[in-house]
């Protein structure tokens, strides 16, 4: 018995397990330590059973969870036990700490035990945040069951040996991707997969490794797919490249699916497109902005990109449309009569016009991109908003669409 108390290791075990001093006012608050042990055992057991069916892969992770919920016997119960026990574990930890602080469990002879507990708590909190990746969260925060159904098609998410090095080079992890675009079956799959969603897409040239980045609202992703690669009514630089290299040398990727329900989501969509434009700097894009690029001072490079869309022959055709044509005497007489018979403007109309042509200046929030307009109407068209919005801003703080500052030119 003396050895049990005097031995360095046995004495430590004896003081905590056998002769452990307990307070005289012991209550149910001392149950949380044992409850934590029960939670830990449940977590380990359910975690092992879930690991038997879960696949830690970008391609199959969501599908394997659905498999556990639908196909595995009592898989739904095991998953919910694992998730909810984790929540209760944290609750019991805080109650356990609170009890220790209230009853002074950090004092001698339990100072060492309390110190070990604090170390375990800090490690637990640190481990909880390990592996968190903000960019992945942005890309997959809105994945739902419909996307899981589409991800069950292997061709949508498995890049070819030609595309994979390009994706790895830029650290791109697409949600969906389509290659072999000359195959009619690929077009059908794209229609089925892209139609319900909105988000950021990317068109990649597999030969030159150049690419185009754009965004589409709900229902328009497939339209963009068809517009750029098949009907050639989208980006002219992409259309010229497809005609030059062939459709089989291109791939269509969905970089991120963004929900599209209200104006706030529309702003989020444009902000995400701006993020990819700034990060990836696509060669096929002409304007470096996602939304209205009015007022942007183009560089020589972007001007050259715009000139590529119009050959010299086409320029001459446009210039010669009305060259050498003259109006007949009948047409001239009709124009003259119309001008002479036009009624003079009333004083009320003149007052309305004077109010509407109030000159304004629009500036970005960061003080860049100053644009002057002769009227509020022109300014509203330029930044895609209603005239009332600008008038309301002029009477208030002067901020329009959370992106611009509007001021009256005096």
UniProtKB/Swiss-Prot annotation:
Q: Where are the transmembrane segments?
A: 32-52, 75-95, 112-132
Q: Topology with regard to the membrane?
A: Multi-pass membrane protein
GO cellular component, as recorded:
membrane; mitochondrion; respiratory chain complex III
Q: Which CDD domains match?
A: Cytochrome_b_N, GIY-YIG_bI1_like
* Region spans: COB exon 1 encoded: 1-131
Alphabetized UniProt keyword annotations: Endonuclease, Hydrolase, Intron homing, Membrane, Mitochondrion, Nuclease, Transmembrane, Transmembrane helix
Which family would the database say this protein is a member of?
To endonucleases of group I introns of fungi and phage.
The protein here is known as Probable intron-encoded endonuclease bI1
| Organism expressing this protein natively | Mycosarcoma maydis
User: What does the record give as the organism's lineage?
Assistant: Eukaryota, Fungi, Dikarya, Basidiomycota, Ustilaginomycotina
């Amino acid at each position: 018995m003396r050895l049990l108390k005097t031995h360095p290791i046995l004495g430590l075990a004896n003081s905590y397990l056998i002769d452990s001093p307990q307070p005289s006012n012991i209550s149910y608050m001392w149950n949380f330590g044992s409850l934590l042990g029960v939670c830990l055992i449940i977590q380990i057991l359910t975690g092992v059973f879930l690991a038997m069916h879960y696949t830690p892969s970008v391609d199959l992770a969501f599908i394997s969870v659905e498999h556990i919920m639908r196909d595995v016997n009592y898989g739904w119960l095991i998953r919910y036990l694992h998730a909810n026990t984790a929540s209760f574990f944290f609750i019991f930890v805080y109650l356990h700490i609170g009890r220790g602080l209230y009853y002074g469990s950090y004092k001698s002879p339990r100072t060492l035990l309390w110190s070990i507990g604090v170390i375990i708590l800090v490690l637990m909190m640190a481990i909880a945040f390990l592996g968190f990746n903000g960019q992945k969260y942005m890309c997959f925060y809105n994945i739902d069951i419909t996307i899981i159904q589409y991800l069950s098609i292997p061709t949508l998410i498995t890049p070819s040996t030609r595309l994979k090095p390009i994706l790895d080079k830029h650290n791109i992890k697409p949600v969906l991707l389509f290659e072999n675009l000359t195959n009619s079956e690929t077009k059908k799959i794209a229609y089925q997969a892209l139609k319900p969603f909105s988000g950021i897409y990317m068109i990649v040239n597999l030969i030159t490794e150049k690419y185009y980045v754009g965004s589409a609202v709900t229902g328009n992703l497939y339209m963009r797919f068809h517009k750029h690669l098949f009907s050639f009514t989208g980006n002219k630089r992409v259309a010229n490249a497809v005609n030059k290299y062939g459709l089989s040398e291109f791939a269509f990727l969905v970089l991120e699916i963004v929900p599209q329900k209200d104006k706030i989501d529309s702003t989020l969509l444009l902000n995400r497109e701006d993020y990819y434009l700034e990060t990836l700097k696509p060669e096929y894009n002409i304007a470096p902005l996602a939304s209205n690029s009015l007022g942007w001072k183009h560089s020589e490079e972007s001007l050259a990109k715009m000139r590529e869309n119009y050959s010299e022959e086409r320029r001459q055709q446009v210039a010669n449309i009305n060259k050498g044509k003259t109006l007949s005497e009948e047409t001239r007489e009709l124009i003259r009569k119309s001008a002479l018979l036009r009624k003079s403007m009333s004083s009320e109309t003149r007052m309305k016009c004077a109010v509407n042509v109030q000159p304004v200046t629009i500036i970005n929030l960061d003080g860049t991109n100053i644009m002057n307009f002769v009227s509020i109407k022109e300014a509203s068209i330029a930044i895609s908003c209603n005239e009332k919005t600008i008038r309301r801003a002029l009477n208030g703080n002067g901020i329009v669409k959370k992106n611009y500052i509007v001021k009256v030119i005096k």
